[in-house]
A protein has these predicted regions:
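Long, charge-rich, low-complexity alpha-helical segments
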Residues: 1-72, 76-152, 213, 218-276
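A general structural signal for short secondary-structure junctions and capping/turn motifs
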Residues: 122, 153, 157-162, 195-198, ...
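Low-complexity, glycine/alanine/valine/leucine- and proline-rich hydrophobic stretches
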Residues: 163-233
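Short, functional C-terminal segments
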Residues: 127, 133-188
């Protein structure tokens, strides 16, 4: 069977599409050549309208993903900030639930938001909730199957837990859990709750999807959160506990088991995988 010749140059249709896409989110670029309006109007004007609609729709996606960030800074500030992010970081996937992963880190370096040092961590928490909604499901290990392991301290110390794919740990030097929780209330209750939040306290949380498909935010002590994060990396429980002596291993395990967040149990990882 005769093979078709290898292409020697980019097909003009994809090349035009690439130029069109690039110009949509780069206002310094002119509209791609060859555009025509069906009614004879100026293609550059119509392209500018379309460009604005695309940016506006992406800003709306970010507003839906980060509602508490938007409430904290106000609609106008958020709209301007999100527009800059969209122009700096256009989507790389057609799946809009994946868009905005870089916003928390970007906000941390966004100078106009420096008066709200907790804003980036609030964005991290909200992104973790979105990821929990869309993460793969996994069957939890039955509590009965873990009973023997829990009763054998030496085996327990060597065990590695595979945690549920929806689980994330968020640790912050700011009261991000309290701030996020206050914004889940009505306006009157929210303002009263916010007045009670100590803005210089550190907070941490586990974020995961529960059996009812809700993304929960469960506050826990920072040391316990650090231990949970170590367990999530596959570290043996004994080593994780040694690295975080202030944490309560029993309390962390109880929390993980109660919410069905242990998806597998294994022995210690090979040395080649644990060394760095």
């Amino acid at each position: 069977m005769t093979q078709p010749p290898a292409p020697t140059a980019m097909d003009p249709a994809p090349a035009t599409a690439l130029r069109f896409a690039a110009a949509l989110l780069d206002t310094s670029l002119p509209p791609p050549a060859g555009l025509h309006a069906w009614n004879g109007s100026d293609p550059a004007v119509r392209f500018a309208v379309y460009r604005n609609n695309v940016v506006h729709s992406l800003v709306a996606v970010l507003a839906d993903t980060f509602p508490v960030v938007r409430q904290l800074v106000g609609d106008d500030f958020f709209g301007a900030m999100a527009r800059l992010y969209v122009l700096d970081h256009p989507p790389r996937s057609p799946l809009m639930h994946r868009y905005g992963a870089g916003l928390p880190a970007w906000v941390a370096d966004f100078e106009p938001a420096t008066a709200l040092p907790y804003l980036s961590d609030i964005a991290r928490l909200e992104w973790a909730r979105l990821c929990a909604f869309h993460a793969a499901d996994a069957e939890p290990v039955p509590v009965q199957a873990l009973a023997a392991l829990i009763q054998a301290p030496q085996r327990l110390a060597r065990a590695c837990l595979e945690l549920h794919p929806t689980l994330a740990v968020v640790r912050s030097a700011h009261p991000v859990v309290s701030l996020w929780a206050a914004h889940q209330l009505s306006d009157a209750d929210r303002d009263a709750r916010l007045a009670e939040v100590p803005l210089h306290s550190a907070e941490a949380a586990l974020i995961f999807r529960d059996a009812s498909d809700d993304a929960l935010v469960v506050e826990l002590p920072d040391a316990d959160a650090a231990l949970a994060a170590a367990i999530a990396t596959g570290a043996p429980l004994g080593a994780a506990q040694t690295a975080h002596p202030e944490a309560d291993l029993a309390r962390v395990l109880s929390l993980l088991l109660r919410h069905g967040l242990v998806a597998g149990v294994g022995g210690p990882l090979p040395a080649t995988e644990t060394s760095a």
